């Protein structure tokens, strides 16, 4: 019986069935706890789909960079891009049919999802303040092969645009720095002539 529960809880059938047919909890507290513990935060199916798609399009990246706020799922330092791959339920995707609220323990889930959304907003703001371009990819955007392909193409384009913007900023910074050095040199030369 335990083997059956383990395989059932780990399958996508369980999650899809519960979303379509909400029902009272038929599992014991320990069984429910086991099912919930099998839900991962890293290397999720949507995250792997995005990684495979980006790799196939020629991008190279870092995973779960814990030196950045919020440990973004995918980081492309060359382009200055941090990608968050969010599950619609766990991150409270507004207007999404997959972001349903559980029927039991409603207060707990509303508070938890609200906290998750607030944490995401703070993390994104912090990353942007550090100069990163933050892209959020939602789980629902990756459902279906044609939708997945078009979303990954759009994501690749957004990454390239962010990289171009980063290059322009670097060039401006270098130019301004060079101009500042020249201006400082001129001021020092004038000062030396006056002495």
Task: Give a label for each model feature.
Residues 14-195:
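Nucleic-acid endo/exonuclease domains
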């Amino acid at each position: 019986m335990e083997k059956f529960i383990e395989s059932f809880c780990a399958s996508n059938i369980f999650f899809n069935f519960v979303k379509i047919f909400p029902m009272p909890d038929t599992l014991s507290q320990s069984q429910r706890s086991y099912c919930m513990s099998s839900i991962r935060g890293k290397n999720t199916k949507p995250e792997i789909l995005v990684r495979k798609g980006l790799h196939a399009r020629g991008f190279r990246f870092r995973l779960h960079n814990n030196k950045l706020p919020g440990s973004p799922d995918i980081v492309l330092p060359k382009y200055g891009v941090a990608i968050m791959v969010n599950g619609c339920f766990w991150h409270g995707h507004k207007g999404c049919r997959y972001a349903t609220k559980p029927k039991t323990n409603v207060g707990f889930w509303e508070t938890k999802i609200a906290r998750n959304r607030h944490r995401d907003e703070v993390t994104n703001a912090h990353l942007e303040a550090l100069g990163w371009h933050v892209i959020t990819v939602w789980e629902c955007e990756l459902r279906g092969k044609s939708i997945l392909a078009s979303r990954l193409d759009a994501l690749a384009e957004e990454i390239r645009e962010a990289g171009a913007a980063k290059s322009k900023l670097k060039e401006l910074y270098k130019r301004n720095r060079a101009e500042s050095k020249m201006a400082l040199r001129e001021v020092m030369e004038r000062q030396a002539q006056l002495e």
